[in-house]
């Protein structure tokens, strides 16, 4: 029964997402960030602390080498893409950033243009590790995680995988977005 299979798959995905959120909360609690109920929340679903930023970067970095797949990625890991990448498991840029931030209990939207609007806008000169870098009008074309020292972590269609790349300024939006305050 296809409906039963779809319902079972949805239930499993929800359980996996909850387990991911619980692990992130447990990790942050062990660092003294937030309580057992979750990380220290700020308005707009943001959390505080340099440890949270480092966890997001470490979680994202653990996916280096995972294939790029347009439309792929979820809060619990890589997933099949859509259109030309249907059947290919991996991340697109926004699915990747969504996965990285879910580890600290922050759910950001799937679409990069919506992610651009979630946090606090920061001038590039004030960028810190963990800020999101966007490209295209309203952040609609690409998103990456700023690492500092002119580097970013991204799921790159050009590289075909999750990778560390030199920061590109061509086409960058006027602001980065800060989700986690340090």
Give the residues covered by each predicted segment:
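Extracellular/periplasmic catalytic domains that process cell-envelope and extracellular macromolecules
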Residues: 49-55, 61-62, 125-128, 136-139, ...
């Amino acid at each position: 029964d296809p409906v039963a299979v779809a319902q079972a798959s949805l239930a499993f995905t929800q359980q996996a997402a909850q387990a991911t959120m619980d692990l992130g909360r447990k990790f942050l609690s062990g660092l003294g960030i937030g309580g057992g109920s979750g990380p220290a929340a700020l308005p707009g679903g943001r959390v505080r602390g340099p440890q949270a930023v480092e966890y997001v970067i470490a979680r994202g970095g653990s996916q280096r080498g995972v294939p790029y797949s347009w439309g792929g990625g979820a809060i619990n890991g890589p997933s099949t893409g859509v259109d030309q990448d249907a059947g290919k498991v991996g991340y697109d840029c926004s699915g990747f950033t969504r996965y990285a931030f879910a580890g600290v209990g922050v759910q950001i939207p799937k679409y990069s243009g919506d992610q651009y609007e979630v946090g606090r806008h920061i001038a590039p000169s004030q960028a810190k590790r963990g800020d999101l870098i966007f490209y295209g009008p309203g952040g609609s074309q690409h998103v990456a995680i700023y690492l500092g020292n002119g580097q970013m972590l991204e799921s790159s269609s050009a590289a075909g995988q999750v990778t560390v790349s030199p920061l590109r300024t061509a086409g960058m939006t006027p602001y980065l977005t800060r989700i986690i305050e340090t």
